[in-house]
Amino acid sequence: MSTYTVRGSFPARDGPQQFEKEVEAPNENVAEERVYSDFGSQHNLKRTQITIEEVA
């Protein structure tokens, strides 16, 4: 599996919160899905509230 860096933002109390997270995944699509899953469970966000800007 490769390591991907996912960058994006989500709404927080003080405005948009930027994030950069490294994820191990077989491809970019799976890395993106894992970020949606992790941030959804940790921050109680829906997928539509998370904006992913780049997967590298």
Curated annotation (Swiss-Prot):
Family: Belongs to the eukaryotic ribosomal protein eL20 family.
Keyword Ribonucleoprotein part of the UniProt annotation: yes
Family annotation (HAMAP family): Ribosomal_eL20
Quaternary assembly: Part of the 50S ribosomal subunit. Binds 23S rRNA.
Regions annotated as coiled coil: none
Record organism: Haloarcula marismortui (strain ATCC 43049 / DSM 3752 / JCM 8966 / VKM B-1809) (Halobacterium marismortui)
Single annotated GO MF: large ribosomal subunit rRNA binding
GO biological process, one term: translation
Full protein name: Large ribosomal subunit protein eL20
One of the record's GO cellular component terms: ribosome
Keywords attached to this entry: Ribonucleoprotein, Ribosomal protein, RNA-binding, rRNA-binding
